[in-house]
């Protein structure tokens, strides 16, 4: 039926060229975006498997289509491994993304118009934590806590807002906070107002799975996450919970048929193998190195005179405030990009610019750690970042750093073995 020679390269040269160029970019650029990583060849293989052909609405053993006996095995493996990896009593592996996992959890826990208490976006939260431009801020009444003067979560403010607004859900989680969340303290705040306690560990899921960051799974009512980022799986979502049969039914219904139809079985299989990878001893070593590399980079940038929000990092990322440098995040991102160093601009506490410009950078170490970078390379890289930010319009400095970055990437290839 299909000719084995019918490759993308021979059939669609334009698309093949774009993919080839992206492959080269990933090999020759230093990736410092905290939410990005490099998946294993196993994860890549499964995302391109024949499981993409199978419709499987429903759950293992309870499908609306025939012929699901083998995809049932794949999904059940993913469920069982997720529960084991995170110490959960319940796992739903069907969410297509972290944002959808959040939407589905909200659907199970709230009605439209109910109040959600979560972290402010400019202080490190996420769009789906009640931003007015997101469904989470359109369908629910969002109230936000932030960071205190020391750069830590302002638990007193959160407790005060909880008493004032009596939210239905209190959410703890972040996309740009470099500290450790006191999950138990949030649990106590939620209990004080009879609210559900939900956590979003999208950024630290791999660290939680490896045991190098505290787990909220048996503290919160519901935990959501992505399966990429530090977990190093496919781009997708996951919902976890401690035992609560009634809530489990509501979560399942919120995913299907509440907001999704047929699950992506090829992605679910990729999740299953990623969870197995995260159970291996070397994954814990990897997670520990992520933390070491982030600390090394943050320390260098502090020594070079840059303001690190929260004073440093205790996880995989840190936020650099450029408010006192007369540099926008947009300018910094572009200059570093010309040097083959990929970062993302980010809003910071006290932000004065628009979200499209910003006054900060978010820097993360999951991807460089996957490549094999250790503290030596991380520190060296931080110095190069500072060299560019110190003289942001100096194209010679940018060119010099680009050459160094290219050489460093050559020593730590990502997928060269696949060529």
From Swiss-Prot:
The record marks 228 as: Plays an important role in substrate specificity. GO terms for molecular function: glycine hydroxymethyltransferase activity; pyridoxal phosphate binding. PROSITE patterns: SHMT (PS00096). Keywords: Amino-acid biosynthesis, Cytoplasm, One-carbon metabolism, Pyridoxal phosphate, Transferase. Catalyzes the reversible interconversion of serine and glycine with tetrahydrofolate (THF) serving as the one-carbon carrier. This reaction serves as the major source of one-carbon groups required for the biosynthesis of purines, thymidylate, methionine, and other important biomolecules. Also exhibits THF-independent aldolase activity toward beta-hydroxyamino acids, producing glycine and aldehydes, via a retro-aldol mechanism. Belongs to the SHMT family. This is Serine hydroxymethyltransferase. It comes from Coxiella burnetii (strain RSA 493 / Nine Mile phase I). The lineage of its organism: Bacteria, Pseudomonadati, Pseudomonadota, Gammaproteobacteria, Legionellales.
């Amino acid at each position: 039926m299909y000719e084995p020679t019918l490759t993308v390269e021979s059939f669609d040269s334009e698309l093949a060229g774009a993919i080839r160029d992206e492959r080269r970019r990933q090999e020759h650029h230093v990736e410092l975006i905290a939410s990005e990583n490099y998946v294993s060849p196993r994860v890549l293989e499964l995302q391109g498997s024949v499981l993409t052909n199978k419709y499987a609405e429903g759950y293992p053993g309870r499908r609306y289509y025939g012929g699901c006996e083998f995809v049932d095995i794949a999904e059940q493996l993913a469920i069982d491994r997720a529960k084991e990896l995170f110490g959960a009593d319940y796992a739903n592996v069907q969410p297509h993304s972290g944002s959808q996992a959040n939407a589905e959890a909200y659907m199970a826990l709230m009605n439209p118009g109910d109040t959600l208490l979560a972290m402010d976006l400019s202080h490190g939260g996420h769009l789906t934590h009640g931003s007015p431009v997101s469904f989470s801020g359109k369908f629910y009444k969002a109230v936000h806590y932030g960071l205190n003067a020391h750069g830590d979560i302002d638990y007193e403010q959160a407790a005060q807002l909880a008493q004032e607004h009596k939210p239905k859900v209190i959410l703890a989680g972040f996309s740009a906070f470099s500290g450790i969340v006191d999950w138990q303290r949030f649990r106590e705040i939620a209990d004080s107002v009879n609210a559900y306690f939900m956590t979003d560990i999208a950024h630290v899921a791999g660290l939680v799975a490896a045991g190098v960051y505290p787990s909220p799974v048996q503290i919160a009512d519901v935990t959501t996450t992505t399966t990429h980022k530090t977990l190093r799986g496919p781009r997708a979502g996951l919902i976890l919970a401690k035992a609560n049969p009634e809530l489990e039914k509501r979560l399942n219904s919120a995913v299907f048929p509440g907001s999704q139809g047929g699950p992506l079985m090829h992605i679910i299989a990729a999740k299953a193998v990623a969870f197995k990878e995260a159970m291996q001893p070397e994954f814990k070593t990897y997670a520990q190195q992520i933390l070491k590399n982030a600390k090394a980079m943050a320390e260098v940038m502090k020594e070079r005179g840059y303001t690190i929000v929260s004073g440093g990092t205790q996880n995989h990322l840190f936020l650099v405030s450029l408010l006192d440098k007369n540099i926008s995040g947009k300018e910094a991102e572009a200059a570093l990009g010309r040097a083959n160093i990929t970062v993302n601009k980010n809003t910071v506490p006290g932000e004065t610019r628009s979200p499209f410009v910003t006054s900060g950078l978010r820097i993360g170490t999951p991807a460089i750690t996957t490549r094999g970078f250790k503290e030596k390379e991380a520190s060296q890289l931080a110095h190069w970042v500072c060299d560019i930010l110190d003289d942001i319009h100096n194209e010679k400095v940018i060119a010099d750093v680009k050459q160094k970055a290219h050489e460093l990437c050559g020593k730590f290839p990502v997928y060269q073995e696949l060529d």
